[in-house]
């Protein structure tokens, strides 16, 4: 369960970083 939460957090961080990067461009 803990590893699943960490994986979800990492996915959210990655997608938010990707969105910010796209907005900057």
From Swiss-Prot:
Keywords: Chromosome, DNA-binding, Nucleus
Record localization: Nucleus; Chromosome
Biased composition (Basic and acidic residues): 9-25
Gene3D superfamilies registered for this protein in UniProt: Winged helix-like DNA-binding domain superfamily/Winged helix DNA-binding domain
Keyword DNA-binding among UniProt keywords: yes
GO cellular component: nucleosome; nucleus
GO MF entry, a single one: DNA binding
Function according to Swiss-Prot or TrEMBL: Histones H1 are necessary for the condensation of nucleosome chains into higher-order structures.
Identification of the protein by name: Histone H1.1
